[in-house]
Amino acid sequence: QGETILHNVPLISDIELMSEVLARLGATVVREGHTLRINTADVDSCETPYELVSKMRASISVLGPLIGRFGEARVAMPGGCQIGARKIDMHLVGLEALGVAFDVDHGVLAATTPNGLRGTHVYLEFPSVGATENMLMAAVTAEGHTAIENAACEPEIVDLADFLISMGARIENAG
């Protein structure tokens, strides 16, 4: 919660869509050139707007943070991928291991944490960047220790881990 300032943010449509998604969730998002100021103090919704998130692949990336903050989330299945259809199975398997229960109805993924998030050991069949990111963002709010085996090790994973650490998370061996 609070304000985050991101620099060197590219001027691309997915950033604009994600900014609108965050605003609809209750965040204040201000763009000044290549800088984004995001304040999430007033985020009060865990349901993403279908008409926006169904247009972009990155929509699944809000799942872990919303679950971590609210214990539940309703997110439209991802769309808008120029590469083609890609599965989100590893996201779901990893989050289920943390204690998330899922239901899919009419293209909307409903997630709940009946017993809260709990640390666990997860093995990813493939080192998916997106699944690793979602697991990290949810796991930092879980009770206990989480180990992600076969996690992605790209620079963006290291950057995310460093960012979460700067906000108080305890993460080791990222990347």
Q: What residues fall within each predicted segment?
A:
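Structural preference for solvent-exposed beta-strand-turn elements
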Residues: Q1-G175
